[in-house]
Each structure stands twice: as C-alpha cells, then as structure tokens.
Amino acid sequence: GTPYYRVGDQVLVLATPMVRRRDSLFVPLQFLTEVLPQRFVQRYHYDGRRAHFTEIAGTGSVQHAGTLPNGLLPGHVVTIDPGHGGSAPGNPGKFFPKGIMEKHVTLQIGLLVRDELESRGVAVRMTRITDVRAPLLERAPMCSDECDLFVSLHVDALPSTRHNYRSISGFHTIIIGEESSADANRVARMENESLRYEIEDGPAAAADALAFILKDLSRNEYFLESASAAHLIQTHLAKIHSGENLGVRQHNRLAVLNTAQRPAVLVEMGYATNRQDAQLMQSRSGQRKIAGALADAIVQYLIEYDHKVGAGALSGAGR
C-alpha cells in the first residue's frame, strides 16, 4: 500500500497507507474526516465533535453562522516569528543595503503580515516586535493551546564557495519530518546558529539542550496540518515571487520547529545572495507583496481547517 494520492497536479500524503485486498481498496479514516470535506466543501461535511459525516444534498455551499466577510470563522490566533534578532543577526544579506541583515528584513515583513492578518479578522502574536533576541527555544511554544498556526520567517543564503551561488533564487517552506536533504541540513545549521547565543552553562547544559531540540518529532500529530499550510504558502508565494518554487521540505533537527506544540512552518522567503530575491525582500513594495501572499495562504489554511473540523465545532483558538 501507499500513503500517497493525487489531486490535480499535487501529490499529497495520508497518515497511513491505503491497502488493496482483492477488488477492494481500504483507505484511512482520515480520508473521510479530512480529505473529502476539505477537497469537496460543497458536497461533504464532517462534524468533529460528534464524529458525524454527512453528504450535503444539492450544490449550494455550506453557510456557517457568524462567519466573517472573507468566510473565516472568528476567533483564530496565529503566531508570527520574525527570525533571529538582536545579537543573533542571521545572514548578513549580500545584496541587501549596507547595514541591513536578515533580522531586519524578517521583522519588517513579519509586522506587515501581522497587519494583513489583523485586517482580515485574525488575532496575531509576535515573538518579537523590535530588534531583540527572542530565545529560540521559547518562540514556537508561544503558539500553544490558544493558537492555530506558528509561522517562522527567514532569509536564505548560499556560501560563496558554491558554484554559481549568486544565480540561485527561490523560496521554500520547511516542516518537521523525516525526509531531510543535504540542502535542508544546510538550512538547519544556519537557522540553528542562534543557539550558540543561548547555551551559556557549559558542555553539559549544551548537551541537554541539544538532546531536547534534536529529538525526533516525525510523529508530530500536527504533521499533516503543517504540510497543508506549507503547500498553501508555496502556492501563494509563487504568484508574486520571480524565483523558483522550491517546494515543501522536511527536517527533524530545526530547533524553532522542534519545540512546536501546534502546526508549524518555517518560510525561507528568498536568497539574500541573489540580487532579484534580495530586492524583493528588502524593498517596501516587495515586502508588501510577500506579506499579502503569506496572509492569503494563512487565511485559506484557516478556512479549510474550519471546513474540516465542521460547522458544529468551536472556531479559533483552543481547538
């Protein structure tokens, strides 16, 4: 059996494999409770509280009482994490203006994402709103029970020793998972660099901290939701980004995600070592485009989640 299935040109994954026995195909319960209600919103509905699946008569769309004008149920909370900050500047930004580094760009875009989401009825928590170093291991836990999604914003950069490093552009989103690649390992080493500013009590404390953050969370119950949010982010960024859509990647040793208690993604918005990417990320017009695309993706994710859990379930925080 295989856990993969195709919707249009997208290949998606189920929690467990499908099984074929003679002339019958057995699919995970998740296909009934999540996939059908999400992909065929007007036809199927699943009430998570009552564990009740229904097929909707007719072709009219399901209307939820109390929805916002954009179709979102009220009460959602999202945590935005502008990567790095303070004494942890991130990458220096080869093609950013002099004095501008990753920590500045992530904060500028993060604040714009906050404004976009709040204007659409989503409450936002920020891990930082000024140029300060928020402890890496305390960022994701800010999105706990009363939060729907954690989004960490970052800027990628390639080493000058890599062939044609300036010509490589694009964006990708990382979630916790097993399918680590050499490039994902490179990103993890770069983004985990902030830890060296935080482990100050000697080798023993460092070993304990690293053992905690490097633990295998591939069984994270929020893997599928994180993957859904990540794919939507890639889809919406592709509409405004001139670089290559590098897709959704997995890694199980990325500190800021390994401490997540809710669905969580890390977005590499472009390469500071590419002139076009850098211009998009540091210009005010480019930042607004990125922020708008991220907000579009987040709102779509929340709306789809509302449909999956059902109109009878409580909306927003604390689900």
Region annotations inferred by a language model:
Residues 29, 33, 107-114, 137-140, ...:
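Extracytoplasmic/secreted envelope proteins and their assembly/folding machinery
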Residues 1-79:
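Primary recognition of N-terminal secretory signal peptides and signal-anchoring hydrophobic helices
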Residues 4-6, 26-28, 52-54, 77-81, ...:
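Soluble periplasmic/extracytoplasmic beta-strand elements of cell-envelope proteins
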Residues 75, 177-215:
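A structural motif
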Residues 59-149, 155-170, 177, 196, ...:
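Active-site histidine-acidic residue metal-binding/catalytic motifs
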Residues 33, 37-41, 111-122, 144-148, ...:
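Sec-exported extracytoplasmic/periplasmic mature domains
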Residues 159, 213-317:
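Active-site-adjacent mobile loop/cap segments within catalytic or ligand-binding domains
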Residues 22-27, 96, 100-108, 133-137, ...:
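Soluble non-cytosolic domains of exported or imported proteins
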